Amino acid sequence: MCKIIAVANQKGGVGKTTTSVNLAASLAVTKNKVLLVDLDPQGNATTGSGVEKSNLDFSVYDLLVGSLTIQDVLITQTADYDLLPSNSDLVAAEVELLKGENREIRLRKAIAHIRDHYEFVLIDCPPSLNMLTINALVAADGVVIPMQCEYYALEGLSALMETIKAIKEELNPHLKIEGILRTMYDPRSKLTSEVNGQLFNYFGDAVYLSLIHI
């Protein structure tokens, strides 16, 4: 049975793409069939998967707002997992999705056609709570949230939690938090320790015990 996981945080530079690519590679190495969806216009997950963005004929943009099928866009000859690639064309998708019908469920409908072929689908989200991220959360079964223990981190995390709550109520009642992953963790920093303590106070068991050091 396929599990779809969105890797999301509206703050940039917290390790979303690094988490997505390494998780995809790790799951693939353990003989799981994995699809990585690059939903960030920066396309760093695409580059990190060994695909040159400038050479793409099609990207996930063509899947979300065009007439192409997922098979038209899918790249299977890369790394140890399959990829739905992204490039800067995806910037325009935000505006075009806002004008279209069924705008929140485009990705879910696309993935529905192929999800039985995979054990895991990982979605690398953009660093904002826009229509692309909403598409990811509507399509997902769970959310992994990478975050740094830094100033304003909890404020941003609270905004994401509110978005997840709204999507659960309106569009995807089965969505759940898989866990919060602390990244770029600096144990020498007093601020890091303070935010880390607050994180456990607010979210408890939702915080992964494993962490990524700076």
Where do the model's predicted regions map?
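P-loop NTP-binding core
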Residues: 1-212
